[in-house]
Regions:
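Dinucleotide-binding Rossmann-like beta1-alpha1 core, especially the glycine-rich loop
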Residues: 66-147
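Active-site/ligand-binding neighborhood in enzyme catalytic cores
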Residues: 138-271, 293
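Conserved Rossmann-like nucleotide-cofactor binding loop
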Residues: 32, 55, 304
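Glycine-rich FAD pyrophosphate-binding loop
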Residues: 41-65
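Feature captures the FAD/FMN-dependent oxidoreductase FAD-binding
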Residues: 85-115, 163-169, 258-265, 270-279
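Conserved flavin/dinucleotide-binding core of flavoenzymes
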Residues: 2-13, 17, 118-122, 346-348, ...
Length: 490
């Protein structure tokens, strides 16, 4: 990896609050905050990036041990025009690894049997994952009436209405677990999967909408392959599922290196308030807190961190709905096995487990099948996910009990025989924001908070999508909005 602090042509501003250089505080050094700070610094803005913990990157962190690679959080992400631009600016193209095209199977468990998820209409007709009755229900989807009520609808209600309960249980439910670790009965269709909801509104049918999208894509009009459609980008090259040779932390390490001198680790922000048209940020540990006056503030923290921060009463009133965003706990358990101790070929992306199967795991990634350098040559790596909205108590279990429960599933589903030769357990007490029914109140609160507090900006995965690509785009977009504000403010 070749990263220099100013390799992208950054203007490196001098320290201090005075002079002609505009100053911005970015709070939270996850992907969104890092990208926002990077983009602002490229524009010549004097940036200070505050991070309460001892490391940057948020949920992205990579452990290397005994020839194994374990991701603490995201294992991969989908590229877009915005992502490709960032990778080029950071000179990371040579570090990128694309997912193995031969590992494109997604297995789903039904009746304790792993079945490839059908990815084409022909495969759907032939799959054993759905009954004949369920397949017929899917084929009749264009005849289902369009919903006329304008109220928010849960994912479960939407899918049952258009495709039937079996598709919900064995096609949609497991993917909800894979993306949100959530419950389709409580997640909002309009906010968790806005593009899919829009297909019904625009075309009256999901089937018709998908056919129209494919037709438009083949003519070069749009790119429908981006993640869930939370943040669209301009048409670009083929979307790719990628990681990096040395793991996902390569991205956040490169961003951190590119903004050298701006990052304050172990420096929690305690108070943000407006004073004489500017913003005062109080940050630091007990006894070492310092104030800094800046022209604008980007809050790139999770919603629950925002809730714990001191702020003036009027600001808290506007932000109140944001503080109620739910974050269920999730544990990731990366296990390494000798190849001969796993009967299954691991010839795919991984396996997802519907809630109806009543298993211990939400799903598992076949990490060493997906990307190289994830395990020694004679071993394999499997990354398992436990907990989420419907099994929160499982995520909180200690490592020994968690390994025991997970091994029970892996032995039955994958034919695992021996004990793991590597294990890495990471517990996330608040993992992924849940875009629940009524989530428009959260988005409205964020908009109102910004409107009532000029120079204050809210960003992060509770606003515009939970994927790494969404967070990259969110950081880029908030930096653009801040830069426009600074220009208008003179």
């Amino acid at each position: 990896m070749r990263v220099l602090a100013d390799m992208t042509g950054n203007v490196t501003p001098t320290e201090g609050d005075g002079g002609d250089v505009r100053s911005v505080a970015v709070v939270g050094a996850g992907v969104t905050g890092l990208v926002a700070a990077y983009e602002l610094r490229r524009r010549g803005v004097n940036v200070t990036l505050y991070e309460a913990s001892g490391h940057a990157g948020g949920a992205i962190r990579t452990t290397h041990a005994d020839g194994f690679l374990a991701e603490h959080g995201p294992n991969s992400f989908v590229t877009s025009a915005a992502v490709d631009t960032l990778l080029q600016q950071l000179d990371l193209q040579d570090d990128v690894v694309e997912a193995n095209p031969e590992a494109n199977k997604r297995y789903v468990v039904r009746s304790s049997v792993m079945t490839p998820f059908p990815l084409t209409p022909g495969a759907m007709l032939g799959t054993s994952l759905l009954s004949f009755k369920a397949k017929l229900r899917v084929l009749l989807e264009p005849l289902v009436r369009t919903r006329t009520q304008d109220t928010d609808e849960s994912v479960a209600s939407f899918v049952r209405r258009r495709l039937g309960h079996e598709v919900l249980d064995y096609a949609v439910d497991p993917f909800i677990s894979g993306i949100f670790a959530g419950d389709p009965e409580t997640l909002s269709m309009a906010h968790a999967f806005p593009r899919v909801a829009e297909l019904e509104r625009q075309y009256g049918s999901l089937s018709k909408g998908l056919m129209m999208q494919r037709k438009r894509f083949s003519s070069g009009e749009t790119n429908p392959a981006t993640h869930e459609g939370h943040l669209t980008s301009s048409p670009a090259a083929r979307a790719r599922l990628i990681s990096f040779v040395d793991g996902m932390q390569t991205l956040t390490d490169a961003l951190e290196a590119s903004i050298a001198g701006t990052l304050r680790l172990g420096c929690p922000v305690r108070l943000v308030h407006r004073q004489e048209g500017r913003w005062v940020v109080d940050a630091g540990q007990d006894g070492a807190a310092r104030s800094r006056t800046v022209d604008a503030v980007v809050m790139a923290t999770p919603a629950h961190v925002l809730a714990a921060m001191e702020m003036p009463a009027p600001m808290r009133k506007f932000a109140a709905p944001i503080e109620r965003v739910e974050y269920p706990p999730v544990s990731t358990l990366t296990l390494g096995f000798r190849r001969e101790d796993v009967a299954h070929r691991l010839d795919g992306f991984g396996v997802l487990v519907p809630a109806a199967e009543r298993r211990n795991i939400l799903g598992a990634l076949f990490s060493s099948s997906l990307f190289p350098s994830r395990a020694p040559d004679d071993c394999v790596t499997i990354t398992c996910f436990v907990g989420g909205s419907r099994q929160a108590e499982r995520a909180r279990e200690d490592t020994d009990l968690l390994v025991e429960r997970v091994l029970l599933d892996l032995r039955q589903l994958l034919g695992v025989r021996g004990e793991p030769v590597f294990a890495k357990h990471v517990y996330w007490p608040r993992a992924i924001p849940q875009y629940t029914v009524g989530y428009q109140a959260v988005k409205d609160a964020a908009d109102t908070t910004e409107q009532q507090n000029p120079g204050l900006y809210l960003a992060g995965n509770y606003r515009n999508g939970v994927s790494v690509g969404d967070c990259v785009a969110s950081g880029q977009q908030v930096a653009e909005r801040v830069a426009s504000y600074l220009t208008r403010a003179g």
